[in-house]
């Protein structure tokens, strides 16, 4: 019993050398079965015939033995060491089968009898492949997995094939995307270049604008249109209403270069339309004639003006019925008579100095009872 316990202790002490043993020196499956039988027969204690674990046997041996150091024999080490190594390998194979059943992976093991040596090798390769897949999916496709005794896993060839397909697909997709990007850049550069050429051709220079403004002013005056007529005609024809000030500043080259470039084509179209319709009444002539609906300057005859002046001396501010009757008698419009009286009163105010009277006002209004009250002239009523 002491010899068995000492052998067990030596077994636990030499665990590190057993773990790092070379996989190439493993024996066949039949020797593993004999070793397992031998281990079970050696490790069976008086506990209902069940084999105990290594740790439990070591603890039992320590509890039953004395504190003296155990003696070891080279013969016992030679007999037990292969047995323990074979038992550890058998436990590793069973753990691999359990790991395979718990965590299935992409690589499938080879089909066949699992009781032979080939089955053990396929199981080991499956274990290594599953470790590679658990560490990272890229390892499964990037490089083949080598197993015990230098054998290549059957699934590694398929992984290499998938790697090639993936690379070819990526290369094809990358080339296709690169071609699309290059074509898009080429089209963008062509459009940009065409836009630049087009803008360079359409953009006039400062000399062109100056020459066009001078010609436009001469032709406008020759055709008989004012600057206000041109601005109104542009608004009616093209939808852009421009004021007289804008047209004047264009002719004087006082607008910005950008605004001059925008206004030049519109004025050029208006000139072409005006030249083509010169000598015949067209829509431009009608629009220019309408203008801003300014009223004509009324010219009053001398006889009519004298009658209005005599009436103003009598009543500088007539009422609405008096204006209507006077307009009918003189054959004038009511609005013309009203405006004339307004202008005449404003003229009278300008002629009267502040706080004084007009020289000779006594002679003018002396015999008249219709003296304007604002002159302050007192006359006796006859």
UniProtKB/Swiss-Prot annotation:
<dbReference type="InterPro" id="IPR013847">
    <property type="entry name" value="POU"/>
</dbReference>
<keyword id="KW-0539">Nucleus</keyword>
<dbReference type="GO" id="GO:0007420">
    <property type="term" value="P:brain development"/>
</dbReference>
<dbReference type="GO" id="GO:0000981">
    <property type="term" value="F:DNA-binding transcription factor activity, RNA polymerase II-specific"/>
</dbReference>
<protein>
    <recommendedName>
        <fullName>POU domain, class 3, transcription factor 2-A</fullName>
    </recommendedName>
</protein>
<dbReference type="InterPro" id="IPR001356">
    <property type="entry name" value="HD"/>
</dbReference>
<dbReference type="Pfam" id="PF00157">
    <property type="entry name" value="Pou"/>
</dbReference>
<keyword id="KW-0371">Homeobox</keyword>
<keyword id="KW-0804">Transcription</keyword>
<feature type="compositionally biased region" description="Polar residues">
    <location>
        <begin position="122"/>
        <end position="136"/>
    </location>
</feature>
<feature type="DNA-binding region" description="Homeobox">
    <location>
        <begin position="293"/>
        <end position="352"/>
    </location>
</feature>
<keyword id="KW-0217">Developmental protein</keyword>
<feature type="region of interest" description="Disordered">
    <location>
        <begin position="69"/>
        <end position="136"/>
    </location>
</feature>
<dbReference type="InterPro" id="IPR009057">
    <property type="entry name" value="Homeodomain-like_sf"/>
</dbReference>
<dbReference type="GO" id="GO:0006357">
    <property type="term" value="P:regulation of transcription by RNA polymerase II"/>
</dbReference>
<dbReference type="InterPro" id="IPR017970">
    <property type="entry name" value="Homeobox_CS"/>
</dbReference>
<feature type="compositionally biased region" description="Low complexity">
    <location>
        <begin position="179"/>
        <end position="194"/>
    </location>
</feature>
<feature type="region of interest" description="Disordered">
    <location>
        <begin position="348"/>
        <end position="382"/>
    </location>
</feature>
<feature type="region of interest" description="Disordered">
    <location>
        <begin position="150"/>
        <end position="206"/>
    </location>
</feature>
<keyword id="KW-0238">DNA-binding</keyword>
<comment type="function">
    <text>Transcription factor that may be implicated in patterning of the central nervous system during early development.</text>
</comment>
<feature type="domain" description="POU-specific">
    <location>
        <begin position="201"/>
        <end position="275"/>
    </location>
</feature>
<dbReference type="GO" id="GO:0000978">
    <property type="term" value="F:RNA polymerase II cis-regulatory region sequence-specific DNA binding"/>
</dbReference>
<keyword id="KW-0805">Transcription regulation</keyword>
<dbReference type="GO" id="GO:0005634">
    <property type="term" value="C:nucleus"/>
</dbReference>
<feature type="compositionally biased region" description="Basic and acidic residues">
    <location>
        <begin position="165"/>
        <end position="178"/>
    </location>
</feature>
<dbReference type="InterPro" id="IPR000327">
    <property type="entry name" value="POU_dom"/>
</dbReference>
<dbReference type="InterPro" id="IPR050255">
    <property type="entry name" value="POU_domain_TF"/>
</dbReference>
<dbReference type="InterPro" id="IPR010982">
    <property type="entry name" value="Lambda_DNA-bd_dom_sf"/>
</dbReference>
<dbReference type="InterPro" id="IPR016362">
    <property type="entry name" value="TF_POU_3"/>
</dbReference>
<comment type="similarity">
    <text>Belongs to the POU transcription factor family. Class-3 subfamily.</text>
</comment>
<dbReference type="Pfam" id="PF00046">
    <property type="entry name" value="Homeodomain"/>
</dbReference>
């Amino acid at each position: 019993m002491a010899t068995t316990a000492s052998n067990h202790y030596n077994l636990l002490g030499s665990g590190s050398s057993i773990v790092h043993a070379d996989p190439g020196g493993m024996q066949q499956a039949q020797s593993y079965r004999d070793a397992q039988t031998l281990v079970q027969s050696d490790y069976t204690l008086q506990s209902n015939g069940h084999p105990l674990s290594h740790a439990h046997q070591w603890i039992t041996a320590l509890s039953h033995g004395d504190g003296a150091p155990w003696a070891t024999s080279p013969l016992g080490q030679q007999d037990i060491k292969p047995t323990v190594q074979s038992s550890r390998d058998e436990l590793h194979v069973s753990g691999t089968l359990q790991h395979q059943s718990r965590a299935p992976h992409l690589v499938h093991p080879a089909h066949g009898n699992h009781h032979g040596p080939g089955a053990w090798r396929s199981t080991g390769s499956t274990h290594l492949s599953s470790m590679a897949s658990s560490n990272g999916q890229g390892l499964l496709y990037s490089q083949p997995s080598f197993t015990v005794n230098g054998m290549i896993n059957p699934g590694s060839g398929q992984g290499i094939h998938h790697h090639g397909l993936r690379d070819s697909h990526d290369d094809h997709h990358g080339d296709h995307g690169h071609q699309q990007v290059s074509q898009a850049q080429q089209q963008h550069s062509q459009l940009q270049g065409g836009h630049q050429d087009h803008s360079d051709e359409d953009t006039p220079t400062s000399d062109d604008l100056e020459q066009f403004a001078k010609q436009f002013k001469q032709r406008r005056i020759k055709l008989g249109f004012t600057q206000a007529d041109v601005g109104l005609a542009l608004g009616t024809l093209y939808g852009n209403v421009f004021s007289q000030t804008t047209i004047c500043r264009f002719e004087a080259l006082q607008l910005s270069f950008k605004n001059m470039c925008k206004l030049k084509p519109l004025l050029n179209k208006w000139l072409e339309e005006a030249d083509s319709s010169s000598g015949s009444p067209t829509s431009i002539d009608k629009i220019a004639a309408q203008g801003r609906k300014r009223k004509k300057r009324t010219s009053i005859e001398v006889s009519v003006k004298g009658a209005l002046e005599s009436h103003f001396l009598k009543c500088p501010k007539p009422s609405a019925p008096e204006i209507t009757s006077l307009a009918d008698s003189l054959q004038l419009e009511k609005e013309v008579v009203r405006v004339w009286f307004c202008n005449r009163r404003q003229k009278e105010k300008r002629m009267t100095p502040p706080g004084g009277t007009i020289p000779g006002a006594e002679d003018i209004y002396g015999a008249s009872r219709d003296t304007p009250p604002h002159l302050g002239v007192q006359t006796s009523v006859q």
